[in-house]
Amino acid sequence: MLFVFILFLPSCLGYIGDFRCIQLVNSNGANVSAPSISTETVEVSQGLGTYYVLDRVYLNATLLLTGYYPVDGSKFRNLALRGTNSVSLSWFQPPYLNQFNDGIFAKVQNLKTSTPSGATAYFPTIVIGSLFGYTSYTVVIEPYNGVIMASVCQYTICQLPYTDCKPNTNGNKLIGFWHTDVKPPICVLKRNFTLNVNADAFYFHFYQHGGTFYAYYADKPSATTFLFSVYIGDILTQYYVLPFICNPTAGSTFAPRYWVTPLVKRQYLFNFNQKGVITSAVDCASSYTSEIKCKTQSMLPSTGVYELSGYTVQPVGVVYRRVANLPACNIEEWLTARSVPSPLNWERKTFQNCNFNLSSLLRYVQAESLFCNNIDASKVYGRCFGSISVDKFAVPRSRQVDLQLGNSGFLQTANYKIDTAATSCQLHYTLPKNNVTINNHNPSSWNRRYGFNDAGVFGKNQHDVVYAQQCFTVRSSYCPCAQPDIVSPCTTQTKPKSAFVNVGDHCEGLGVLEDNCGNADPHKGCICANNSFIGWSHDTCLVNDRCQIFANILLNGINSGTTCSTDLQLPNTEVVTGICVKYDLYGITGQGVFKEVKADYYNSWQTLLYDVNGNLNGFRDLTTNKTYTIRSCYSGRVSAAFHKDAPEPALLYRNINCSYVFSNNISREENPLNYFDSYLGCVVNADNRTDEALPNCDLRMGAGLCVDYSKSRRAHRSVSTGYRLTTFEPYTPMLVNDSVQSVDGLYEMQIPTNFTIGHHEEFIQTRSPKVTIDCAAFVCGDNTACRQQLVEYGSFCVNVNAILNEVNNLLDNMQLQVASALMQGVTISSRLPDGISGPIDDINFSPLLGCIGSTCAEDGNGPSAIRGRSAIEDLLFDKVKLSDVGFVEAYNNCTGGQEVRDLLCVQSFNGIKVLPPVLSESQISGYTTGATAAAMFPPWSAAAGVPFSLSVQYRINGLGVTMNVLSENQKMIASAFNNALGAIQDGFDATNSALGKIQSVVNANAEALNNLLNQLSNRFGAISASLQEILTRLEAVEAKAQIDRLINGRLTALNAYISKQLSDSTLIKVSAAQAIEKVNECVKSQTTRINFCGNGNHILSLVQNAPYGLYFIHFSYVPISFTTANVSPGLCISGDRGLAPKAGYFVQDDGEWKFTGSSYYYPEPITDKNSVIMSSCAVNYTKAPEVFLNTSIPNPPDFKEELDKWFKNQTSIAPDLSLDFEKLNVTLLDLTYEMNRIQDAIKKLNESYINLKEVGTYEMYVKWPWYVWLLIGLAGVAVCVLLFFICCCTGCGSCCFKKCGNCCDEYGGHQDSIVIHNISSHED
């Protein structure tokens, strides 16, 4: 929505009667026509509309620059308004009040020759701003006395601003009549610039970027030069050309012109000469020719075929839309309000349809931290939301840790629950203590019902923050005064129930000490003292004299709505139609092609149109109220055949027909001169002459097609662009067969002529188990001398483990590569039904992809298979659990949920009639009704009391039986427990005796073992002496040599194993690479290689996981019959030009040379599609080198000689190892008596097993469904009606008898006799 100056901002703009502004009496309400559209277009070829980049000079360069430029070929709008002595109120609103967006380019006419003598302004003033009030900056470009006065100030614009060509009229010394400021306003720029007053027109270039405003100027139709730039830090949203008030000179025509066209961010190609002057410019997205120039970065591109991607495929512009001039949300004002709630009564406020600046907000409240949940904090800046809700409260100093996500402290369990599933940000900030008053309020209604008072319970400390430690919920029947010793009207009592707070809820109530509740006067209700409310605590919020506050910012509807952050907000841009652009429409992003349409199906609150698939299909611009359709950008290839002598190229939209090209605005040309469909796609700007053939072609389009251009054809035929699409045939087939010779002779070859479907299964190993080795343990075991000498081998063991780790890493990397190849682009599916019967099973691909989804842990026997009553039944029924000694379940099975069968399902227990002791509400009502009826109308209704009597008696029997079983079980438990205690005591005695005997024997053996150890020490001392003698006799060199020999042998074996591991890993690496290659070439695509994916020509391949590898199933067609043909590797035409076949052979067929494919014999004529032209018929020969492997075997020395070299005689002295076994005391224990006693105790414990009578627990539902209540209600109504007429007819209701009138008179005699009969019968 566009904002008109005074109509929407009366507090900011000039007021009526201000001597600096025009009076309303000098205005009128005449309508004004729309701005005129120029016939002149923006011609950027000479640099018009461009500008010299600040602080940069380019010499003799052609380069691409991205900036804010007009669209080449766009038109101007004249926004100048002329007045004499009055202005029109309609001048100050759209379409003359416009959106500034990225910027504007203006061409302004110099009116010096038309203005009266003494005039100081030769063109209107332009103002650029947002609110045009004293709180925002406004850019003013105003002419005065041959200079340009540029100012950026916080002006207050008049209600009816204008530019006067002679401001000194009537003694008014003001420069301009457009602002009301008496005192100088706040300015960031005020400068004057020289103006060439003799120029025909002035050219201005205004744009904004990153909060900075840029102004450029020129006095001739060329590139503009830098005027000034100023950082404003805000977005300028609109501009206005002030009306030009002037009385022209006599006889002159006065028509001010202020031509304006919008700027957009686009790419231009510039050419700079040796002086750094722009000599030519090209808008890269304006035409196909300009796109080719930008692609080649040349103003004169050469002849060729170019693949276009900038304009037709990739977005080349941006359409950005936000609702303009929304009010500020003022979230910071609410966050910094003096009254701050406690966690117990946290507050929420929702903001919608407004803007906020998150950076300013954080600075304003002096934020300490900001953490976001389910969204990156950086993504909040610049986003739009449906609405924003903010919850805040003061934080007790000791409970800050409770506000961490997932914490279960007091603040989150009993005060405020943070919703971890919501998109939100948690803000911690502080306020000075003098600006904060804590509002401690208990929101509980049931606490206040019994006398809760905030100040009386919590106190009045300004910075104490109250929080609940536990919350309680109560039923409506709860009364804390229901005690026998307290006078109170309470008659029933239910206990409070502890509860946690849910998301968005407050604490339901604090705990109550019921002993402190009561009232001497029962008519004044139940009142609790202040000290009776418990379960809360308090702490100060102050840290360093600042109160800590928590705010939870809930972000609702991300990327939708009109509640936007202005931190990274861009200015609105023009809606560019007909090209592929990126768009951001009120937070909805994407890319597409816009086309303006007339649509009446948008409601006033609707802006976006979607299709049935949820894709954005249309858009209504709130700024201009125009409607657009949005089509997807063309994602194919566009080939442009460009000839340097032609003004435009011929186009080929590959793989797409022309109807789609023009219906989706892919082409820039709405009505091209000519176009047609070919088998390559849509051809534009060329004639269809594919029936003609050319031997030479400069613009080859592929597939044997050529674009030919002729300047003469374009000149003589006005309906032709000069391009034509023809067939490219570099030679004539008949000429080939007349003068052709085979290159390098003829060869016989068998070529397939018939095929069958083949099936091939293949396993490729891609991984193996990992191996690690403890090198020292493998070589030396636990031998210390060996380990010491092994150190001399250096890093051999370290290298072993390094090699094994390298092998393991290699296996891991190959496994990741294989998994990546499988997961990218492999569509896994089962075999489709094909009507072929037979034992063919679907392939199970689940091991390949693993378990996906929430059904992984569920099966038919899992949680999903559990069955029970429905949720509706659980809602309509209450559950009651009964002790069942054997008849409750049988009773329930008999009734089947029909409570009227109560007495029909009486059970028998040990000969006694019993019923379950619990009755539902409906059963109680029924039996009560029967008992009441029996008491009211005896003896006729006495029978109605029989069911009640029987029910009571049977249920009393049920209670008695249950109590009897429980009593018998209690006696059995007591008896068995006593027996068990006796047996346990006896078992402990026997165990104590046995342990005594064991102790004496163990002590004796310990002494004997001590003697044995002394003897062993002596013997092993002798052994050590002998070994020492042996080592002394052996030379140190010989001992090391023996150890070294063993180490060498084992290291050799280990080295061989490591070599084998390396070799195996190399094989696995090769096979894994082959598996990846087969996945990519066989599974994801169809290969042309023979016998690579199965046997024969590949059709289809499937892959499945297997232990340590992949299992492939290939389908291919295998040749079953062949023909023998004479083939040639090439042909020589006329002895100077050669031909080579493409993916096939040249064969002789009936004496004529033809081409056939290598996989199937099918002779066809030789064309450029199946052959390649060579410059000569020469053949190059290469001889392969002769390389042979070395087959010599090494000759090692004789083994016996090497053994004798190291063998030495050894002598050993055996030590005396005899032991004195006589000193060992071998004692046998006799524990038979103690074991028997323990066995008896165990037997008694076993006999104490309690065989209790089974008492089950049965769960029954006691509430009837709604339809049963309906039937009971209808029956009750019927009974009441019946009783009413009985009372009338028997005279029992005299009042009713009088009201019935004549209705009952005719039965009066009969009624009296019945009454007398009843009385007499009763008296008898």
Swiss-Prot record:
GO biological process: endocytosis involved in viral entry into host cell; fusion of virus membrane with host endosome membrane; fusion of virus membrane with host plasma membrane; receptor-mediated virion attachment to host cell
Transmembrane segments: 1266-1286
Mutagenesis / variant outcome for changing Y162F: No effect for infectivity on murine cells
Record-level Gene Ontology MF annotations: identical protein binding
Keywords on record: Coiled coil, Disulfide bond, Fusion of virus membrane with host endosomal membrane, Fusion of virus membrane with host membrane, Glycoprotein, Host cell membrane, Host membrane, Host-virus interaction, Lipoprotein, Membrane, Palmitate, Signal, Transmembrane, Transmembrane helix, Viral attachment to host cell, Viral envelope protein, Viral penetration into host cytoplasm, Virion, Virulence, Virus entry into host cell
Effect of Y162 to A/H/Q: Complete loss of infectivity on murine cells
Coiled coil, from the record: 999-1043, 1227-1255
Signal peptide boundaries: 1-13
Domain of life: Viruses
Protein name as catalogued: Spike glycoprotein
Species whose genome carries this gene: Murine coronavirus (strain A59) (MHV-A59)
